[in-house]
Curated annotation (Swiss-Prot):
Principal location class: cytoplasm
Positions of the UniProt region annotated as G4: 138-141
Region annotated G1, chain positions: 19-26
Annotated segments matching region G5: 175-177
Protein name per its UniProtKB record: Elongation factor Tu
Length: 396
């Protein structure tokens, strides 16, 4: 087979395996690494099942999650792949965004078909904004009857369509175990799966290509020069002499011009996603800007006070609450750099939320926050994290 050469210019895509416990998510991950390592040895190393299964702990927004990262390449792309072994870890990762996903491989056992967690994962993927799902129909070697495979495929497609994912997404029958054992037929099924991943998961939009946004971390005055706002640029880029808008927390937004950009005490012509910068802003007093606001390309982000969110509430063992909460719960919602108090309304039919639950909620904040759908937040009580969530829908 022709050797693919390593190119830094390859698109980088973050993906993950999702699906019901015991349907073979981790085995599928291991099979992908092995088959690609055999096909493109100078690009890939195989990761054994037990390496992936012993997922190291990570902290994201104050929550501990067990999660494994592996990387591999096809001829077209470089992939970072996350696998969360436990159902709870999976849910926590989806909601906190510890590992972003540009697309997901839904693993469904052909012997079982979609199960309750399959549905829950797909629903959650929709709510946290995973852009694309395709399907690995695993354990296909154990099903002799093609009609059964077709039935399972139909069920999976209905499930995807119900959550507004692509009903025509590739559904690839595989046997991860047989591929790990080196069976040529099933090794090919993994190559087919990765060809489908290459083709169907769209290239992600890079952060630098999005409109400029920088959360304000600090504000100070430089005598003789004016007001400087500092922070890490979250997305996009900004140039000297460009107009920007300062949004959130206050009733009205303020427009101003960036007259200087500084990083590590050096002056720059522009700053881009990932840079920690100080922006010198024209005609703005120190008291006009505060932590928690964002500096943006004018007109690209708006402040809101009411939204629907999907949240995971920490269990007692994770350092969360010891007791449930009810309607009209009033914690702080930590967005980007600041806490804002909000009042929680639970979905109809939900009496209370227990520590360890994941839930939908409507929130009404006491101050406006610059937000887009998909923005993540922590739920805090007096500085202690008790939950994490993501904005699913902006109401007002």
């Amino acid at each position: 087979m022709a050797k693919a050469k390593f190119e830094r210019t390859k698109p980088h895509v973050n993906i993950g395996t999702i699906g019901h416990v015991d349907h073979g998510k981790t085995t599928t991950t291991a099979a992908i690494t092995k088959v690609l390592a055999d096909a493109f040895p100078d690009l890939n190393e195989a990761s054994a099942f037990d390496q992936i299964d012993k997922a190291p702990e990570e902290k994201a927004r104050g929550i501990t999650i067990n999660i494994s990262h592996v990387e591999y390449q096809t001829e077209k792309r470089h992939y970072a792949h996350v696998d969360a072994p436990g159902h709870a870890d999976y849910i926590k990762n989806m909601i906190t965004g510890a590992a972003q996903m540009d697309g997901a491989i839904l693993v469904v056992a052909a012997t079982d078909g979609p199960m309750p967690q399959t549905r829950e994962h797909v629903l959650l993927a929709r709510q946290v904004g995973v852009p694309y799902i395709l399907v690995a129909l695993n354990k296909a070697d154990m099903v002799d009857d093609d009609e059964i495979l077709e039935l399972v495929e139909m069920e999976v497609r209905e499930l995807l369509a119900a959550q507004e994912f692509d009903e025509e997404a590739p559904v690839i029958p595989i046997s991860a175990l047989k591929a790990l054992e080196g069976d040529p037929k099933w090794t090919q099924s993994i190559l087919d799966l990765m060809a489908a991943v290459d083709e169907s998961i769209p290239d992600p939009v890079r952060e630098t290509d999005k409109p400029f946004l920088m959360p304000v971390e600090d504000v100070f005055t430089i005598t003789g020069r004016g007001t400087v706002v500092t922070g890490r640029i979250e997305r996009g880029s900004v140039n000297v002499n460009e107009e920007v808008e300062i949004v959130g927390i206050k009733e009205t937004s303020t427009k101003t011009t960036v007259t200087g950009i500084e990083m590590f005490r050096k002056l720059l012509d522009s700053g881009q996603a990932g840079d920690n910068v100080g922006l010198l802003v024209r005609g703005i007093k120190r008291e006009d800007v505060e932590r928690g606001q964002v500096v943006v390309k004018p007109g690209t982000t708006t402040p809101h006070t009411e939204f629907e969110g999907q949240a995971y509430i920490l269990s007692k063992d994770e350092g969360g609450r010891h007791t449930p909460f009810f309607n009209n719960y009033r914690p702080q919602f930590y967005f980007r750099t600041t806490d804002v108090t909000g009042v929680v309304t639970l979905p109809e039919g939900t009496e209370m939320v227990m520590p360890g639950d994941n839930t939908e909620m409507s929130v009404k904040l006491i101050q406006p926050v610059a937000m887009d759908e998909g923005l993540r937040f922590a739920i805090r009580e007096g500085g202690r994290t008790v939950g994490a969530g993501k904005v699913a829908k902006i109401i007002k």
